[in-house]
């Protein structure tokens, strides 16, 4: 496997002092496995995995399928209580805290890599808007207990290139010790390729219905709610 950039190029970039991390990558053919099969392997070694499809304008199928596992950091916030890793604190502006975290992982762009080479993956709930727009805070009971924001920081990325039928493996290395970091990244890339080739797939546990299915409202009630929502949208309330 060829690893890019080279160690000499990494050291030169590190000496500029512009970046703190850098993606080292290699490629393997994808003719022996699919993204779905790969995510089953990842689920067998980590409880935190993701799969994202890229999409571009006027494309029916995106070029890349991104997969990741074993996040480096978890970030959550609910009702102003933020948790970054094992550290908890109160905040009125989680966006500011998230931007600060991202600033510590600034990395260079390479033309031969897809636009996503690692970073935060997760969701922002509807209630997240209330931090910048307090008027949207709902006064109903939150039975679902969804977090306002739930993100994970991934420094290893598996990207299926659906156009060229190859898999791009990426590991983000720290640039404070470029030689040591590069050797570690290369070792992780080799381990990642080995995992994809030989890893065991996790058996899926399918759910099943344990009780009767009941509807919350009838068709007329549903249509009435839709019409009411449409009026609110037309009037600018939503």
Where are the regions that the model predicts?
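Short hydrophobic "helix-edge" motifs at membrane interfaces and signal-peptide entry regions
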Residues: 112-115, 226-227
């Amino acid at each position: 496997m060829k690893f890019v950039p080279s160690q000499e190029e990494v050291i030169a970039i590190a000496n500029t002092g512009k970046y703190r991390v850098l993606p080292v990558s290699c490629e393997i053919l994808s003719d022996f496995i699919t993204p779905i099969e790969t995510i089953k392997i990842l689920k067998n070694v980590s409880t935190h995995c993701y799969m994202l499809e890229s999409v571009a304008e006027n494309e029916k199928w995106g070029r890349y399928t991104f997969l990741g596992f074993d996040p480096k950091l978890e970030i959550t916030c609910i009702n102003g209580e933020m948790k970054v890793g094992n550290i908890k604190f109160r905040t009125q502006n989680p966006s500011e805290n998230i931007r600060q975290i991202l600033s510590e992982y600034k990395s260079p762009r390479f033309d031969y890599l897809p636009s996503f080479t690692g970073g935060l993956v997760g969701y922002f709930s509807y209630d997240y808007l209330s931090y910048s727009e307090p008027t949207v805070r709902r006064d109903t009971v939150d039975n679902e207990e969804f977090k306002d924001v739930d993100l994970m920081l991934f420094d290893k990325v598996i990207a299926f290139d659906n156009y060229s039928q190859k898999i791009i493996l990426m590991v983000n290395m720290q640039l404070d010790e470029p030689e040591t970091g590069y050797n570690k990244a290369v070792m992780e890339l080799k381990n990642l390729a080995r995992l994809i080739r030989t890893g065991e797939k996790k058996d899926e546990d399918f759910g099943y219905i344990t009780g009767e299915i009941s509807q919350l409202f009838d068709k007329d009630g549903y249509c009435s709610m839709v019409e009411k929502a449409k009026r609110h949208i037309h009037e600018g309330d939503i």
